């Protein structure tokens, strides 16, 4: 499996295709990332490539982590991510990972932290139907029954109820790469991706067999 790249979500915009149709797109500042470590079966029990992204101040980095990062370059990096690979001979510590690793027409999987919406009710969080809104109704946005009575005498774990909505790590798969600007480290993908503008996201090649740009992991 090929390694991915870390980036920052800039926001959404639109492009127009050859027929004049508006296509919603997300702009991503992808990389550049630096290879900070190569893990091997002999030393670590598995093979992987670790990359770093985003500059960090010296006061925010612990001494052990600082020593680890300085082995691959002079700049201290804020975010680290590793990718499992079959072998590490084609990678070298200190090398840069950029948007040139991707190509237009390729499909990618993008992971990020979804936007937190705080405490939300049944309708907003789970899409429940509401009750009658007419005068006299006492069940406008109530959930209805949450279970039986004496047996089981409790609410089963996992019951869909009101609670904290969003703020979870999710992945959107099979997004099409429409445009690449390697001068600005810009990656343009079709559709939306998790997170708010400015959030850190992980972009990796789609591994669904049979899809364009995908490969067998």
From Swiss-Prot:
InterPro entries: Ribosomal_uL3, Ribosomal_uL3_bac/org-type, Ribosomal_uL3_CS, Transl_B-barrel_sf. PROSITE patterns: RIBOSOMAL_L3 (PS00474). GO terms for cellular component: cytosolic large ribosomal subunit. Signal peptide: none annotated. Residues 142-153 have a biased composition (Low complexity). Keywords: Ribonucleoprotein, Ribosomal protein, RNA-binding, rRNA-binding. Residues 127-162 are annotated as: Disordered. GO terms for biological process: translation. It comes from the Bacteria. GO terms for molecular function: rRNA binding; structural constituent of ribosome. Transmembrane segments: none annotated. One of the primary rRNA binding proteins, it binds directly near the 3'-end of the 23S rRNA, where it nucleates assembly of the 50S subunit. Part of the 50S ribosomal subunit. Forms a cluster with proteins L14 and L19. HAMAP family: Ribosomal_uL3_B. Belongs to the universal ribosomal protein uL3 family. PANTHER family: 50S RIBOSOMAL PROTEIN L3 (PTHR11229), LARGE RIBOSOMAL SUBUNIT PROTEIN UL3C (PTHR11229:SF16). This is Large ribosomal subunit protein uL3. It comes from Prochlorococcus marinus (strain MIT 9301).
